[in-house]
From Swiss-Prot:
This is C-X-C chemokine receptor type 2. CDD domains: 7tmA_CXCR1_2 (cd15178). Keywords: Cell membrane, Chemotaxis, Disulfide bond, G-protein coupled receptor, Glycoprotein, Membrane, Phosphoprotein, Receptor, Transducer, Transmembrane, Transmembrane helix. Disulfide bonds join C117-C194. It comes from Canis lupus familiaris. Residues 1-46, 104-118, 182-206, 270-290 are extracellular. PROSITE patterns: G_PROTEIN_RECEP_F1_1, G_PROTEIN_RECEP_F1_2. Coiled coil: none annotated. The chain crosses the membrane at residues 47-73, 83-103, 119-140, 162-181, 207-229, 250-269, 291-311. GO terms for cellular component: external side of plasma membrane.
Length: 356
C-alpha cells in the first residue's frame, strides 16, 4: 500500500480556492398547488361576523317569539297557514339557540368538542330543510285556495298536523348524514373546526352524501314553490282581485328572499370546488372559504327575516300584536282597529282573496 505524504498538499490543492467559492443559497421552487395551504383570516373579519351573528340572534328571538305569541294568543281556531308559520317560527328559534356557539367558533375555532359539533350541526340542517319544506307547504296551500278556490283538503286540521310531523321527520332524516359524520377536527396550520370526517375519501363521499338531501330538501321544494306561486300569480292577474297587489308583493318576497338567502350558499357549498367543477388551489380554497362565510350569513339572516315576510307584512298580524299589547296595558285600546280579525294570515275560505 502506497503511503501519501500530506505535507506536500495545501488546503487549496484539496478544496480549491475557498475564498472565491460561491454557495447556492436559493431554495427550490415549490409549485403553488404543492405548498401547504394556510387559511387566510383577518381578526377584523372574524369580529364583524360575530357582530352579525349577534344581530341575527336578537332579531330571530324577538321576531319569531312575537309570531308564536300572536298565534297562540289567537282566540279562534288557527288557519292552516297559521299552523305552518308556527312550526316555521319554532324551527327558526331552535336554530337561534346555536348562533352564540357558531359566533364563538368564528373567533376561537371549534373548542366545544365532537358531541356539541354534532348537535348544533343537526339543528342547523333541520332548520334549513324544515324551513323550505314548510314554505313549500304554504305555497301549495295558497295554490289550492286561490287557483282552485278550495279549502276542502287543507281545512282538515288533523291532516295539517300530520303534514307538519312528516316535515319534521323528513328534515331529521335528511340531516342524519351530517349528524353521523360531523366531528371536531384539528387540521394543520389552522384552528379546530367542526366538519365531516369520512377518512381518505372525504371529498368523494361528501358529494354523494349531499346529493340526495339537496335534491329532496332543496331543489324539489324550490320547484314546488316556483310552480305554485307562478300559477297563483297568473290567477290573481286574470281574476283582477282587489287584494292582488298585496298578495303579489308577499309572494314575490317569499320566493326572492329565499333565493337570495339560501341559493348562493348552496351554490358555493355543494358545487364549484367541492363538486370539482373548478380546479382546487390554495388561493381558490381561501376564496371559497370567504365566500362560504358571506353566503352563510345570508342564509342565517333568512331565519330572522321570516317574521317580517310572512307576518309583519300582513295586516292581521299587526292587529293581533296590538291586541296583545292592549291586553297587557302597554298601549291604549284606542289604537286597536275596529274590525281586526284574530288570524294574522288573513285567508278566506269563501273566496280566493288573501292577505298573506
Amino acid at each position: 500500500m502506497e503511503y501519501i505524504n500530506w505535507d506536500n498538499y495545501s488546503l487549496e490543492d484539496l478544496f480549491g480556492d475557498i475564498d472565491n467559492y460561491t454557495y447556492n443559497t436559493e431554495m427550490p421552487i415549490i409549485p403553488a398547488d404543492s405548498a401547504p395551504c394556510r387559511p387566510e383570516s383577518l381578526d377584523i373579519n372574524k369580529y364583524a361576523v360575530v357582530v352579525i351573528y349577534v344581530l341575527v340572534f336578537v332579531l330571530n328571538l324577538l321576531g319569531n317569539s312575537l309570531v308564536i305569541m300572536v298565534v297562540l294568543y289567537s282566540r279562534v281556531s288557527h288557519s292552516v297557514t297559521d299552523v305552518y308559520l308556527l312550526n316555521l317560527a319554532i324551527a327558526d328559534l331552535l336554530f337561534a339557540l346555536t348562533l352564540p356557539i357558531w359566533a364563538v367558533s368564528k373567533v376561537k375555532g371549534w373548542i366545544f368538542g365532537t358531541p356539541l359539533c354534532k348537535i348544533v350541526s343537526l339543528l342547523k340542517e333541520v332548520n334549513f330543510y324544515s324551513g323550505i319544506l314548510l314554505l313549500a307547504s304554504i305555497s301549495m296551500d295558497r295554490y289550492l285556495a286561490i287557483v282552485h278556490a278550495t279549502r276542502r283538503l287543507t281545512q282538515k286540521k288533523h291532516w295539517v298536523k300530520f303534514i307538519c310531523l312528516g316535515i319534521w321527520a323528513l328534515s331529521l332524516i335528511l340531516s342524519l348524514p351530517i349528524f353521523v359524520f360531523r366531528r371536531a377536527i384539528n387540521p394543520p396550520y389552522s384552528s379546530p373546526v367542526c366538519y365531516e370526517d369520512m377518512g381518505t375519501n372525504t371529498t368523494k363521499l361528501r358529494i354523494v352524501m349531499r346529493a340526495l338531501p339537496q335534491t329532496f330538501g332543496f331543489i324539489v321544494p324550490l320547484m314546488i314553490m316556483l310552480f305554485c306561486y307562478g300559477l297563483t300569480l297568473r290567477t290573481l292577474f286574470e281574476a283582477h282581485m282587489g287584494q292582488k297587489h298585496r298578495a303579489m308583493r308577499v309572494i314575490f318576497a317569499v320566493v326572492l328572499v329565499f333565493l337570495l338567502c339560501w341559493l348562493p350558499y348552496n351554490l358555493v357549498a355543494d358545487t364549484l370546488m367541492r363538486l370539482q367543477a373548478i380546479e382546487e388551489t390554495c388561493q381558490r380554497r381561501n376564496d371559497i372559504g370567504r365566500a362560504l362565510d358571506a353566503t352563510e350569513i345570508l342564509g342565517f339572516f333568512h331565519s330572522c327575516l321570516n317574521p317580517l315576510i310572512y307576518a309583519f307584512i300582513g295586516q292581521k298580524f299587526r292587529h293581533g300584536l296590538l291586541k296583545i299589547m292592549a291586553f297587557h296595558g302597554l298601549i291604549s285600546k284606542e289604537y286597536l282597529p275596529k274590525d281586526s280579525r284574530p288570524s294574522f294570515v288573513g285567508s278566506s275560505s269563501a273566496n280566493t282573496s288573501t292577505t298573506f
